[in-house]
Design a protein with these regions (language model features):
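Residue-level signature for tetratricopeptide repeat
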Residues: 12-13, 45, 52
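TPR/TPR-like alpha-solenoid helical repeat scaffolds
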Residues: 45-46, 78-100
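Alpha-helical linker/edge segments of TPR/alpha-solenoid repeat scaffolds
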Residues: 51-56, 90-109
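TPR/TPR-like (Sel1-like) alpha-helical repeat modules
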Residues: 59-77
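A hydrophobic membrane-anchoring alpha-helix module
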Residues: 99-147
């Protein structure tokens, strides 16, 4: 399988939690993609944008985008374009389920705890406020399928 350098860059941006940059990179691919691939790219884009919304305390936007992403990516399981779609979906669904249990005022604390859990930040947070929800999920990460 051959993937474009732009696709590789978008995946790297996603995995570095540069969700807005990932959106820009993959959107350029999505626009010109064959019809059969559009939903795949759009699904990954929506996971990225959902995480971006979460990072900006937009709980409703995160829930909507992650839900749309799950619907779009489910047809591409278990893997597609060298991506472990099944694992990405599991992570996105676990995050979506946790977000659906949050109140809007908990969004910032939840995001900080997710980042702390993933090692992305050293910010202090109230570790007692949402431990079960944070333990039940993680920020999605795109893994390659090993052939």
């Amino acid at each position: 399988m051959v993937t474009s350098p732009e696709f590789e860059r978008g995946i790297a941006e996603f995995n570095q939690q540069q969700f807005y940059a990932c959106h820009d990179t993959l959107e350029a691919i999505w626009v010109d993609a064959p019809e059969a691939d559009k939903r795949f790219y759009q699904g990954i884009l929506q996971v990225a944008v959902g995480c971006y919304h979460l990072s900006n305390d937009n709980l409703r936007g995160a829930i909507i985008l992650l839900g749309e992403a799950v619907r779009r990516l489910c047809d591409y399981q278990p893997d597609y374009e060298g991506i472990n779609v099944e694992q990405l979906l599991e992570q996105a669904m676990a995050l979506l389920k946790a977000l659906q249990q949050l109140q809007p005022e908990q969004t910032s604390d939840f995001w900080q705890q997710l980042q702390k859990q993933s090692g992305a930040t050293n910010k202090e947070y109230n570790s007692d406020s949402l431990p079960d929800l944070v333990a039940s999920c993680q920020l999605p990460y795109i893994n390659r399928v090993l052939n």
